């Protein structure tokens, strides 16, 4: 359910684009992100930093799209977001010696210490590549194709990457004392 909630602005963007075009879809995505943050705040009295970053990026790039009536800005939004994620993962690890993937996943999975830096790096590379793929699709295909890819292509790539990670990590997962072998 959280997965669908996280996709709420993207799904509304997609539906609105199909009916009303890119500019209305952009406005809806901005509004939907504000609504999403409001809902999270009302329920938890706390909003994850990644949601705030998403809001800032959609407001800046979506706002530029609407002000200048140029869809190029909104097409850059996923790339900026993915590259920002990649940079944060990389820099947090290199400069602050903080493995953010480990911080986020340590309660869900137990891995040997040497695996965590590789997992962090693989996510940083994945987000970097996703940004490049977004630009490739945005500049080489129609806006309609880009919008379809934004929802279905990125979701498919993310799903495939998570499955691949699960398979590769399977051999490293440490059993806890209360798990049966």
UniProtKB/Swiss-Prot annotation:
Q: How does it sit in the membrane?
A: Multi-pass membrane protein
The secretion signal range is none
Transmembrane as UniProt keyword: yes
> What are the protein's UniProt keywords?
Cell inner membrane, Cell membrane, Membrane, Transmembrane, Transmembrane helix
Q: Which InterPro entries match?
A: YciB
Does the record's keyword annotation contain Metal-binding? Answer: no
Q: Which residues cross the membrane?
A: 24-44, 49-69, 72-92, 119-139, 149-169
Give the main localization category.
membrane
Gene Ontology cellular component annotations, sorted alphabetically? plasma membrane
Q: Out of the domains of life, which is the source?
A: Bacteria
Subcellular compartments: Cell inner membrane
Which Pfam families does UniProt cross-reference here? IspA
Protein family membership: Belongs to the YciB family.
Q: What job does the chain carry out?
A: Plays a role in cell envelope biogenesis, maintenance of cell envelope integrity and membrane homeostasis.
Official protein name in the record: Inner membrane-spanning protein YciB
Lineage at the top is: Bacteria, Pseudomonadati, Pseudomonadota, Betaproteobacteria, Nitrosomonadales
Q: Which gene encodes it?
A: yciB
């Amino acid at each position: 359910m959280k997965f669908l909630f996280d996709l709420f602005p993207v799904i509304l963007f997609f539906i609105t684009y199909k009916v009303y075009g890119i500019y209305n879809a952009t406005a809806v995505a901005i509004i939907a992100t504000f609504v999403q943050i409001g809902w999270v705040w009302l329920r938890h009295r706390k909003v994850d930093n990644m949601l705030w970053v998403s809001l800032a990026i959609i407001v800046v790039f979506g706002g530029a799209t609407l002000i200048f009536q140029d869809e190029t800005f909104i097409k850059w939004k996923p790339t900026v977001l993915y590259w920002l994620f990649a940079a944060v993962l990389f820099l947090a690890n290199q400069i602050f010696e903080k493995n953010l993937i480990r911080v986020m996943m340590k309660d869900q999975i137990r891995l040997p210490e040497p695996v965590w830096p590789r997992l962090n790096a693989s996510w940083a590379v994945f987000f970097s590549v996703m940004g490049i793929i977004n630009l490739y699709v945005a500049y080489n295909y129609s806006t309609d194709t880009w919008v379809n890819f934004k929802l279905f292509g990125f979701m498919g790539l993310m799903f495939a990457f998570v499955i691949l990670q699960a398979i590769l990590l399977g051999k490293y997962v440490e059993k806890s004392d209360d798990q049966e072998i």
